[in-house]
Amino acid sequence: MAPRPLNEIVEAGWAKALEPVAGQITSMGEFLRAEIAAGRTYLPAGANVLRAFQQPFDDVRVLIVGQDPYPTPGHAVGLSFSVAPEVRPLPGSLVNIFRELNTDLNLPQPANGDLTPWTRQGVLLLNRALTTAPRKPAAHRGKGWEEVTEQAIRALAARGKPMVSILWGRDARNLRPLLGDLPALESAHPSPMSADRGFFGSRPFSRANDLLMRLGGQPVDWRLP
């Protein structure tokens, strides 16, 4: 079966931005089909693998980079750190993100872990690797997704529009050179294993808004229902 054109599976602006890696996206699709053929599955569900690229490319004003999807079945939804509304309990990283959101902006605890409202505010929730194997963190790291997501970041940086990046953890911080002169906020990862080493108290949400306004952009409304 011939691969579907990019403009049928991602937003039009992203289709153009990702054109240099269209062949790599096709190769990753073949890799995932081979996994299924070999009796292995992957996360998130196929329809959500490229979900981050379904929001308008031109509207992105904050980039939050994750490592790879949650490995717990039922958790990964194609947006870094987000889960479906019905997921309980919340992943530890997300619990800590919400704790910092409250400390930073005095916002109440959200009703669930669905971060989709942030994407409507122009926040791109992007994992470096877009798939993983169930119960195996980082299983697909180094398999080829990095070429795709790094092109996405380079394309965002080349737009010449106000954007702030929030880089949590070493994997995300390694992407700093791709951002050129655009501002980036760096801290420890919100994982329970590292949040006490610089994530708590980093105030990424208010600082991102301050930087956006300094660049002439509009602040993000970080409230969640």
Swiss-Prot record:
Q: Which keywords label this protein? A: Cytoplasm, DNA damage, DNA repair, Hydrolase
Q: What is its EC number?
A: 3.2.2.27
User: What is annotated as the active site?
Assistant: D68
Q: Give the range the annotation lists for the signal sequence.
A: none
Q: What is its main location?
A: cytoplasm
Q: Which CDD domains match?
A: UDG-F1-like
Q: Enumerate the catalysed reactions.
A: Hydrolyzes single-stranded DNA or mismatched double-stranded DNA and polynucleotides, releasing free uracil
Localization: Cytoplasm
Give any Gene Ontology cellular component.
cytoplasm
Instruction: Name the job this protein performs.
Output: Excises uracil residues from the DNA which can arise as a result of misincorporation of dUMP residues by DNA polymerase or due to deamination of cytosine.
Quote the PANTHER family the UniProt record gives: URACIL-DNA GLYCOSYLASE
Q: What family does the Swiss-Prot or TrEMBL record give for this protein?
A: Belongs to the uracil-DNA glycosylase (UDG) superfamily. UNG family.
Protein name according to UniProt: Uracil-DNA glycosylase 1
Which gene is the coding source of this polypeptide chain? ung1
